[in-house]
């Protein structure tokens, strides 16, 4: 995210194999997601079918989202995977969230949405970011919701052995435009800065009293 721009004279800049998703539930299958009326609709386009399936999955996911009354609800996300090897793609719910935000951005037909893709119009992000999977061995420690520093455990015991914890982190790119401020801000009159922001995810950790448990910890999730 881009820090709120302010006049240069008024503001000083300060630095700052097997797999599973914890908490993920699915229901039904691709044949039942469409409902009883699918048989009478005929053959639909692949894009419309894909949109329908995603919306069904998003509706299901809303059941396990924190209450909107919780002021920290928007800080929760599912960017943790338990796997025997490095994941090859971003987490499923991350992709669904991105797609949902894209659909909510404009109230238009699917065809218009496809042609209004930012990539087609040559649009650029205000701040450049990079995303990658990192292991608990790379993170070592993290800060939990109470502000305490906890140790992130590298492996999680499962019935048939152990799986490693992987975290999908997004941060501001160390190359390119990030060092020069937010893209699109007139540097002659405004100061701006791209900075990495964090969210809470659930991970297996150990506190300073050697107590092991699932806790919400902060990881880098956006720029």
UniProtKB/Swiss-Prot annotation:
Q: What are the UniProt keywords, alphabetically?
A: Cleavage on pair of basic residues, Disulfide bond, Glycoprotein, Growth factor, Secreted, Signal
User: Any idea where this protein resides?
Assistant: Secreted
Propeptide positions: 6-114
What GO MF annotations does this protein's record show? Answer: growth factor activity; nerve growth factor receptor binding
Report the leader peptide range. Answer: 1-5
| Pfam families (UniProt xref) | NGF
Q: Kinase: is it a keyword of this entry?
A: no
Known InterPro entries for this protein? Brain-der_neurotrophic_factor, Cystine-knot_cytokine, Nerve_growth_factor-like, Nerve_growth_factor-rel, Nerve_growth_factor_CS
Q: Which residues are glycosylated?
A: 107
Cystine connections: 127-194, 172-223
Gene Ontology CC:
axon; dendrite; extracellular space; synaptic vesicle
What role is this protein assigned?
Answer: Promotes the survival of neuronal populations that are all located either in the central nervous system or directly connected to it.
Which named protein is this? Answer: Neurotrophic factor BDNF precursor form
Q: Which organism is it from?
A: Boa constrictor (Boa)
């Amino acid at each position: 995210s881009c820090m709120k721009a302010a006049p240069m004279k008024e503001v000083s800049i300060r630095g700052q194999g097997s797999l599973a998703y914890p908490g993920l539930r699915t229901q039904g299958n691709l044949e039942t997601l469409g409902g009883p009326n699918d048989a009478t609709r005929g053959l639909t386009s692949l894009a419309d079918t894909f949109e329908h399936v995603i919306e069904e999955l998003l509706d299901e996911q809303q059941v396990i989202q924190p209450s909107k009354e919780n002021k920290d609800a928007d800080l929760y996300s599912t960017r943790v995977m338990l796997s025997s090897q490095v994941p090859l793609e971003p987490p499923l719910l991350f992709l669904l969230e991105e797609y949902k935000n894209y659909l909510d951005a404009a109230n238009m037909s699917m065809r218009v949405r496809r042609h209004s893709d930012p990539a087609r119009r040559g649009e650029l992000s205000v701040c450049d970011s990079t995303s990658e999977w990192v292991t608990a061995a790379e993170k070592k420690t993290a800060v939990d919701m109470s502000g305490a520093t906890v140790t992130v455990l590298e492996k999680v015991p499962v019935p048939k052995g152990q799986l490693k914890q992987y975290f999908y982190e997004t941060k501001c790119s160390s190359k390119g435009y990030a060092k020069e401020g937010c893209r699109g801000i007139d540097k002659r009159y405004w100061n701006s800065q791209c900075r990495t922001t964090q969210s809470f995810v659930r991970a297996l950790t150990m506190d300073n009293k050697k107590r092991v448990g699932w806790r919400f910890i902060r990881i880098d999730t956006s720029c």
